[in-house]
Amino acid sequence: MEQTFFMIKPDGVKRGFIGEVISRIERRGFSIDRLEVRYADADILKRHYAELTDRPFFPTLVDYMTSGPVIIGVISGEEVISTWRTMMGSTNPKDALPGTIRGDFAQAPSPNQATCNIVHGSDSPESATREIAIWFNN
């Protein structure tokens, strides 16, 4: 049984999509193994987004991710990583297809910024292990 880390980002929480996201996870047949409300800080975000810390948009990303609470969790099921990523939709809300979480709900704040995209999910088993450790063993 595969596990992955997921997050409902501040825009998803503020706009009231917690129940919708959780319902989609449950309807797909995945188990929710852990679920917590957190406030992210710059330190945990630097570890979570380690590959992005040198990018010019990183301070904006930190501002966005610390703008309100996030819901973090661990879900499990067969092929949960790839299936959850498909359910989320494209990272850029403008490219996300209808029927995906981002396609149905996300809003890009400007043409050059795609950070307000409702949810996050690990992209590989290695990322899932790393992200679960960062957020739950912190």
UniProtKB/Swiss-Prot annotation:
One of its GO terms (molecular function) is metal ion binding. Its main location: cytoplasm. Pfam families: NDK (PF00334). It is found in: Cytoplasm. The active site is at 120 (pros-phosphohistidine intermediate). Keywords: ATP-binding, Cytoplasm, Kinase, Magnesium, Metal-binding, Nucleotide metabolism, Nucleotide-binding, Phosphoprotein, Transferase. Its EC number is 2.7.4.6. GO terms for cellular component: cytoplasm. InterPro entries: NDK-like_dom (IPR034907), NDK-like_dom_sf (IPR036850), Nucleoside_diP_kinase (IPR001564), Nucleoside_diP_kinase_AS (IPR023005). GO terms for biological process: CTP biosynthetic process; GTP biosynthetic process; UTP biosynthetic process. It is an enzyme of class 2 (transferase). The keyword DNA-binding does not apply. It comes from the Bacteria. The keyword Signal does not apply. ATP binds at residues 9, 57, 85, 91, 102, 112. Its cofactor is Mg(2+). Major role in the synthesis of nucleoside triphosphates other than ATP. The ATP gamma phosphate is transferred to the NDP beta phosphate via a ping-pong mechanism, using a phosphorylated active-site intermediate. Belongs to the NDK family. Homotetramer. PANTHER family: NUCLEOSIDE DIPHOSPHATE KINASE. This is Nucleoside diphosphate kinase. It comes from Streptococcus agalactiae serotype V (strain ATCC BAA-611 / 2603 V/R).
